[in-house]
């Protein structure tokens, strides 16, 4: 620590503290993370040493920059770049209910996906993706940090330890099933939902209720200001079956993210869209995601060969035939929205605007119906009819409409 001046303590956790420091000769700000080794189990000590070793080898523009590390007085000290914007949790609190623009949200999502794709391509599973581990620079770019729970996977390996933060844990981890890279995709989906909605994707008063919500993928509607494309991207990361979740590389190929991807640093050409218009339409209609692609290979210094970590996962196009059944009201809302959107999108750009408005209306109505707020539901739908209708009639009409669309969706799947 002789080369640094301590300015203040900026964080404290179960295993250590973080300090804002200034390098004496460079006069540049850094963060020193001190991880206590005294009174820790051998497993915790090993994790601290592993974090020090791992982060020194990571080289990505969207991962916190490593500066130095050492061991002193039963502590592991890790020096990384300082992000003036704080973390995403702090950003949400400071916004005071004002939602971020879709442009900003998409830019952050792309940067995080590039960081995760880099990690996965180098066999690193983060395992603790959450808003407090995502940092913002003064230029409003993201940096992924805190690799204390990260794991380096061997070829075809899966992880099995139950680690992480409960609200961001995927269903397979909670079910004590070995998990892989798709667990990070789930956690990122939780983060993006929270940044968009200013509330956790899954929240409950106790662990049993939380697990139940996660297993049912019981999500509240996202704010109406965001497009249906962005909402579908976030929800695709929160599919219960990991085989039906897209990889980071697949998400980066989505047409909706291309304008933001082009603005990123050190962009690999493999993420540029190359599918024909007909192929693009086919994939959009069935899954909302483009076909699989190989991710960019940027090896880190441990010199293990990069691999196509998700090659055994099924194509995300199977998501249209997903046999899992979440809560009925949630499923009906999603199915009806997607079916109507597809019909509108075949017509004109004006129809797309109407489709997005319709999606927001249906999500709101489904939420009110689920909560049995029939009076509010009546108020929402009253402008669409010439005569006043009772809340009971409104609820019956909405339920029948959603069920009819569901039947149509099932018929369409049977005919494919």
Swiss-Prot record:
GO molecular function annotations of the record: ATP binding; protein serine kinase activity; protein serine/threonine kinase activity
Keyword match RNA-binding: no
Pfam families from the UniProt entry: Pkinase (PF00069)
Catalytic reaction equation(s): L-seryl-[protein] + ATP = O-phospho-L-seryl-[protein] + ADP + H(+); L-threonyl-[protein] + ATP = O-phospho-L-threonyl-[protein] + ADP + H(+)
Binding, ATP: 10-18, 33
Keywords: ATP-binding, Kinase, Nucleotide-binding, Serine/threonine-protein kinase, Transferase
Region (Disordered): 277-334
GO process annotations (BP): cortical microtubule organization; lateral root formation; negative regulation of ethylene biosynthetic process; protein phosphorylation
Biased segments, Basic and acidic residues type: 302-328
Active-site residues, Swiss-Prot/TrEMBL: 128 (proton acceptor)
Highest taxon of source: Eukaryota
Domain (Protein kinase) ranges: 4-257
EC number(s) stated in the UniProt entry for this protein: 2.7.11.34
Keyword ATP-binding assigned: yes
Family per record: Belongs to the protein kinase superfamily. NEK Ser/Thr protein kinase family. NIMA subfamily.
Function as written in the Swiss-Prot or TrEMBL entry: May be involved in plant development processes.
Protein name: Serine/threonine-protein kinase Nek6
Taxon lineage: Eukaryota, Viridiplantae, Streptophyta, Embryophyta, Tracheophyta
């Amino acid at each position: 620590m002789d080369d640094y001046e301590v300015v203040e303590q900026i964080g404290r956790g179960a295993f250590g503290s973080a300090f804002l420091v200034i390098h004496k000769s460079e006069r540049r700000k850094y963060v020193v993370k001190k991880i206590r080794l005294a009174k820790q189990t051998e497993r915790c000590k090993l994790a601290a040493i592993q974090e020090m070793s791992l982060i020194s080898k990571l080289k990505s523009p969207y991962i916190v920059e490593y500066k130095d590390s050492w061991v002193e007085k039963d502590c592991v000290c890790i020096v990384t770049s300082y992000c003036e914007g704080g973390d995403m949790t702090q950003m949400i609190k400071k916004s005071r209910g004002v939602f971020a623009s879709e442009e900003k949200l998409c830019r952050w999502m792309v940067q995080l996906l590039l960081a995760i794709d880099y990690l996965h391509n180098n066999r690193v599973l983060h395992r603790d993706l959450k808003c407090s581990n995502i940092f913002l620079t003064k230029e409003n770019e993201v940096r992924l940090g805190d690799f204390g729970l990260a794991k380096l996977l061997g070829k075809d390996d899966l992880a099995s330890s139950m680690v992480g933060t409960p609200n961001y844990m995927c269903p397979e981890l909670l079910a004590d099933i070995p998990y892989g890279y798709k667990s990070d995709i789930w956690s990122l989906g939780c983060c993006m939902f929270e940044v968009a909605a200013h509330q956790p994707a899954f929240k409950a008063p106790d662990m049993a209720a939380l697990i139940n919500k996660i297993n049912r993928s019981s999500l509240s509607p996202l704010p109406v200001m965001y497009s249906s494309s962005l909402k579908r991207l976030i929800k695709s990361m929160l599919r219960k079956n990991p085989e039906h979740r897209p990889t980071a590389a697949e998400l980066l190929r989505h047409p909706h993210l291309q304008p933001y991807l082009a603005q990123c640093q050190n962009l690999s050409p493999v993420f540029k869209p190359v599918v024909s218009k007909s192929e693009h339409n086919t994939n959009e209609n069935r899954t909302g995601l483009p076909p699989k692609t190989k991710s960019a290979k940027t090896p880190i210094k441990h010199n293990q060969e990069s691999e196509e970590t998700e090659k055994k996962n099924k194509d995300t196009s199977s998501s249209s035939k997903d046999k899992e059944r979440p809560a009925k009201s949630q499923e009906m809302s999603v199915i009806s929205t997607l079916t109507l959107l597809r019909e509108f999108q075949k017509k004109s750009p004006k129809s797309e605007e109407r489709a997005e408005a319709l999606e927001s209306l249906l999500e709101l109505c489904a939420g009110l119906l689920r909560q049995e707020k029939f009076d509010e539901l009546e108020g929402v739908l009253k402008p669409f009819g010439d005569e006043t209708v009772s809340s009971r009639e409104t609820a019956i009409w909405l339920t029948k409409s959603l069920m009819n669309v569901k039947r149509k969706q099932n018929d369409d799947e049977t005919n494919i």
